[in-house]
Amino acid sequence: MAPTKGSAKGKADSKKSNPLASASKVSKKKAAKRPPPQEVKSKARTEASQLKKTKKREYSEAELDLPKLNSITPVGVVKPKGKKKGKVFVDDPEGMATILAIVNAEKEGQIESKMMKARQLEEIREAKLKEAEARQAQKKSKLEEAKDSIRNKKKHKGDGNAKSASTTAQTNDSSSKSKGKRKSVSFA
């Protein structure tokens, strides 16, 4: 059940009976007033202050313990075992010049041998071409000889048998005419 109000009589009496309640009301001072809350706006990511990246620390080569390049180990120094082998560059120019001279001599020798091989291959190609031309000339000469011999045979036969050649030609013509008159059937 909901609470019920008391009678109006009781309330009026209670106010009169309480001497402090009838005294003039003095308002209590509230605690210091707060300013009204303001909306906090988040900054956009495209804003210049947000886009600036923080500088990363750059380490020097000494701090990183990187191996030094282009250095040769002195004669007395022994490399520790297990260390990875790499290219070792020469510091002194005389040593480098001698190494370069050796390498260049090897390369020149290879180049010279390549040139020699190329010359030999060229000579072989030329020889093969000459052989092929000679073969073709032989074939042509044989063909011409065969043609001449056939012509000579026809000339010798044609002198005595001129009439027989003409009669065989007529029979060949008549047989070709009969073959030409064949019936043909066409389908639509």
Swiss-Prot record:
It is found in: Nucleus, Nucleolus. Residues 178-188 have a biased composition (Basic residues). InterPro entries: Loc1. GO terms for cellular component: nucleolus; preribosome, large subunit precursor. Its main location: nucleus. Residues 1-89, 130-188 are annotated as: Disordered. Residues 130-151 have a biased composition (Basic and acidic residues). Keywords: Coiled coil, mRNA transport, Nucleus, Ribosome biogenesis, Transport. GO terms for biological process: intracellular mRNA localization; mRNA transport; ribosomal large subunit biogenesis. Residues 103-157 form a coiled coil. Residues 163-173 have a biased composition (Polar residues). GO terms for molecular function: mRNA binding. Required for efficient assembly and nuclear export of the 60S ribosomal subunit. Belongs to the LOC1 family. Component of the 66S pre-ribosomal particle. This is 60S ribosomal subunit assembly/export protein loc1. It comes from Aspergillus terreus (strain NIH 2624 / FGSC A1156). The gene is loc1.
